[in-house]
Each structure stands twice: as C-alpha cells, then as structure tokens.
Curated annotation (Swiss-Prot):
Annotated TR mART core domain residues: 70-261
Organism name: Bos taurus
Cellular-component GO terms for this entry: extracellular region; membrane
The gene coding this protein: ART5
Protein name as annotated: Ecto-ADP-ribosyltransferase 5
MF terms (GO), sorted A to Z: NAD+ poly-ADP-ribosyltransferase activity; NAD+-protein-arginine ADP-ribosyltransferase activity; nucleotidyltransferase activity
Source organism phylogeny: Eukaryota, Metazoa, Chordata, Craniata, Vertebrata
C-alpha cells in the first residue's frame, strides 16, 4: 500500500505553500529545501472550551479588522454576497453559522491573495502571545475558518470515522522530514484534494499522500467545487510513514496521529502561549472539552510518555 502510494505521480498537487521548519537553498537544484517539524512558531489555536465565547467576540473583532485591512474587507464582502446565493441549497451541521461559510469562501477565492496573507500570518504569528495580540491581523478570520472545519468534520476524529486519504503538492519547495517516523504538523491551513488527477495538475516539487482525521471536505462551500478540496487545520499532528526521492521530486506519506497539539488555546481571551505543544485527541475540540480538561489531558499524555508508553513526537 505504501509503495503504491509513493509511486502515484511525478507531477502533483500544489495548492498553497506550507511552512514548518528550517529552510535552506540548494543552488545545484535551484530549489528551496525545508525540513518538516512540529512548526513551533505557528499560531495554532483550536479554541477548545471557548468557541461560544469567541463567537460572541468575533463579530465586533471582524468589523475592527476589516476597517484596518482593505483586502480583508473587500474579500469578506464579496464572499458574503456569494454565500447568500449558495447557502439555500446546502445542508449544514448544527451550529454552523453564515460567518463560517463566508470564511471558507474567502479562503478558497484564489482571485485574491488573502489566503496567502493568512497562511503567512499563521506560519509566523505564534512566536509569542504578545506578538499575536499586537500584530496578527486575521484573528476573527482564523477563528471562523477553524470553527468551520471543526463543525464540518464533526467530533470524534478518527474514532468516529476512518482517516480520509487526500493528496497535496507544493511547487518550488522540497519538503524533507528529519527521519521517517517523525511527528510533524503542516503549520498552516493546508489545502488538499480527494481527487488525485486534480492534485497532479498543480505542481511537482513535493507530493504528499495524507490520511487526515481533522481535515474537512469543503467542496460544497468552495469557490472552486471541482477541486474537491479537503482543508486541514494547522494543529493536526501527522506521522511520516514513508519518504522517497524520485529525481528532483519529493514523495511523502503522512498519516494522522488522531491527535492535535497546540501552543495556544483561547489566546484572544487572554490565555498565554504554552512552552510546549500540548497533545490532546482530535475529538476534544470546540466546546466538547473545557479549557481545564484540555490541560489535564495534555499533562496525562506527557506523564504516560515519561513511563515509557508511546507518545507521538517523542523522538523529536
């Protein structure tokens, strides 16, 4: 199965560049090589235990941020009009609000560059809580998009339904794991496709075959439904199952650990950055866990590791 996956294609999907580790330039190949990691500088809030409070705060927060960011305001207004036409024909999960759908349409509209700005901010915006509060310009959009994926995917992670196989590629960057078996995060909102043929039309430098537990199918809400997109949140932890080189192409298989890890939780409400990335099951998202339960689960996970049980990321 793994070998078959790695032989899939020689020119594969490239939706958006992801960033997770140290970069170096290889002048002999004319490409950037980037090592995958747990992406410690990512803003990775999953809003565990505070999603309802954030729903209340985000309304005014979005207005404030749109007033300070012209492209955000224009993109949101365009998506809002499109959403009003699209929403009538959709069957949406309980709790799914218009803002969640609009956020997805904002993100998938590649006619503007807002998705790139958002992901650049996500990749680098988690250096500190103070930096997030002062300089992260998409707090409301990040919340709405994160919450949309949680609601569309549903609770329970892979305990509720099996890992979903998707494909993703990146042009101009060769992503490399430090070793097979590493735990890594993609470190941004990462687009992928259910359709390998679609995936192979987007790039060739790095090809990922992924099995995700928290990626959500957004085809019905996307500006480009024909891409059969599955959007993966920044906090999902993957294990590198296999890696190979085929000429100047990197081929990698990632399998979800069915865990998320976050340095941040409810940051906008005052929760500071944790010194280590705390692991909890993917099923414990939104308000299904309290903030206290999130911390307790994380502490127990680390304790089990010290007793010699398997912990994803222990070798990093």
């Amino acid at each position: 199965m793994i070998q078959a996956t790695l032989l899939i294609s020689l020119s594969c999907l490239s939706f958006y560049t992801l960033g997770s580790g140290v970069r170096r330039y290889d002048p002999g190949q004319g490409v950037t090589i980037q090592y995958l990691s747990l992406a410690p500088d990512t803003f990775d809030d999953a809003y565990v235990g505070c999603s309802e409070e954030m729903e209340e705060k985000a309304v005014l927060l979005l207005e404030k941020e749109m007033a300070n960011h012209t492209r955000l305001r224009e993109s949101w207004e365009t998506a809002q009009k499109a959403w009003e036409q699209k929403r009538a024909g959709l069957t949406l999960p309980p709790g799914f609000r218009s803002q969640h759908g609009i956020a997805i349409m904002v993100y998938t509209n590649s006619s503007n560059t807002l998705y790139r700005e958002l992901n650049q901010a996500v990749r680098t915006g988690g250096g500190s809580w103070e930096s997030y509060m002062k300089h992260f310009p998409f707090k409301a959009l990040h919340f709405y998009l994160t919450r949309a994926l949680q609601l569309l995917r549903g609770g329970g992670g892979c305990s509720r339904e099996p890992r979903q196989e998707v494909f993703r590629g990146v042009r101009r960057i060769h992503f490399v794991p430090k070793s097979v078996g590493d735990s890594i995060r993609l470190g941004q909102f990462a687009s992928s496709s259910l359709d390998e043929a679609v995936a192979c039309g987007f790039g060739s430098a790095t090809f990922f075959s992924l099995r995700t537990c928290s990626g959500a199918p957004i085809q019905a809400l996307s500006v480009f439904p024909e891409e059969r997109e599955v959007l993966i949140p920044p906090y999902e932890v993957f294990v590198v199952s296999n890696f190979s080189k085929d000429g100047n192409k990197s081929l990698m298989t990632l399998s979800s650990s069915d865990q998320m890890c976050s340095h941040f939780n409810c940051a906008y409400l005052g929760e500071k950055k944790r010194p280590s990335c705390e692991f909890v099951p993917i099923g414990g998202q939104g308000d299904s866990l309290s903030k206290g339960a999130f911390s307790l689960l994380s502490w127990k996970t680390l304790l089990l590791a010290s007793w010699g049980f398997q912990l994803l990321g222990a070798g990093l």
